[in-house]
């Protein structure tokens, strides 16, 4: 754990060299980077951490600006500049950090990313609500979301299963199409996330006043965008928005891959990140 001045964040650090910071997805925690952290720390100073209110980090009630926590973590670890590797909404936080402090970020790798200010299609949001209510009845779900109830383990397991099928796998796929260890790890992280979220003080992300959706043209650092071709099409569209909006960005498409390539295709993603980081390191 490290005290950033505003909270306490659980983190791991290994290796020496140029700094990279791995920012996990909202449906996971820092363990989703197990393979990448171990491999990349051979040549880089690798850092991974849990968001505030996630994993081993401190709880928080009320609004939280995760991109500011990321920059505060870099300050606490005396990292002046880093490549940020962010997945899902961790990618959104990485981009917001880069826009808030462009001198602190020398490259971005965005894996199935989210985006601050992006307006999700109503059909996508409606499907998510329907799936949640199919897993847990409305009355209990409302109580859980207020963080003032003891969650029923069967509700936790049901919600984790639904979320894993909807987001991690993607439409029309079955768990058998994912390596068993990847499916098990995804379910474990989701179960622990819901068990904690539903029994802890309620917090909500607070996004920058000037969101990334209107500022992609300001990003000039090398940017790699990774898209899983089996994940929800509306999430794939966000990756496309990044590649269209960031000049010179590169898109990597991974077939038969859902929302967490770091878990489902660890070797492929690690190789792609290593090649990208090597290019960044060799830039004049």
What is each residue range found by the language model?
Residues 1-20, 42-44, 79, 203, ...:
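Alpha/beta-hydrolase fold catalytic core
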Residues 5-59, 66, 73:
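Conserved HGGG/HGGXW glycine-rich cap/lid loop of the alpha/beta-hydrolase fold
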Residues 38, 205-257:
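Conserved loop-alpha-helix segment in the C-terminal half of the alpha/beta-hydrolase fold
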Residues 67-82:
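Conserved acidic catalytic loop of the alpha/beta-hydrolase fold
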Residues 86, 90, 94:
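Gly/Ala-rich beta-loop-alpha elbow adjacent to hydrolase catalytic centers
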Residues 99, 106-152:
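Flexible "cap/lid" loop of the alpha/beta hydrolase fold
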Residues 147-201, 205-206, 210, 215:
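Conserved alpha/beta-hydrolase catalytic His-Asp/Glu region
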Residues 245-284:
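Catalytic active-site module of serine/aspartate enzymes centered on a nucleophile-bearing elbow/loop
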């Amino acid at each position: 754990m490290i005290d950033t001045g505003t909270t306490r964040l659980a983190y791991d650090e290994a290796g020496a060299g140029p700094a990279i910071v791995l920012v996990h997805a909202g449906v996971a925690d820092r363990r989703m980077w197990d393979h990448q952290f171990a491999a990349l720390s051979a040549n880089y100073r690798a850092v991974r951490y849990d968001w505030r209110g996630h994993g081993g980090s401190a709880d928080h009630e009320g609004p939280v600006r995760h991109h500011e926590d990321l920059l505060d973590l870099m300050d606490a670890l005396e990292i002046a500049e880093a490549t940020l590797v962010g997945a899902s909404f961790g990618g959104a936080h990485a981009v917001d950090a880069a826009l808030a402090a462009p001198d602190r970020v020398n490259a971005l790798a965005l894996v199935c990313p989210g985006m601050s200010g992006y307006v999700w299609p109503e059909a996508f949001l409606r499907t998510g609500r329907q799936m949640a209510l199919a897993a847990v009845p409305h009355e209990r779900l409302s109580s859980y979301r207020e963080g003032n109830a003891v969650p029923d383990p069967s509700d936790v397991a049901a919600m984790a299963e639904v979320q894993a099928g909807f987001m991690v796998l993607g439409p029309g796929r079955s768990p058998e199409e994912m390596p068993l260890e990847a499916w098990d790890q995804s379910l474990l992280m989701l179960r622990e996330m819901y068990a904690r979220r539903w029994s802890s003080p309620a917090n909500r992300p607070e996004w920058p006043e000037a969101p990334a959706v209107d500022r992609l043209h300001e990003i000039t650092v090398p940017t790699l965008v990774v898209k899983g071709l089996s994940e929800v099409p509306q999430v794939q569209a966000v990756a496309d928005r990044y590649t269209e909006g960031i000049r010179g960005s590169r898109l990597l498409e991974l077939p038969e891959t859902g929302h967490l390539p770091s878990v489902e295709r660890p070797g492929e993603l690690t190789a792609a990140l290593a090649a990208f980081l090597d290019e960044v390191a060799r830039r004049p």
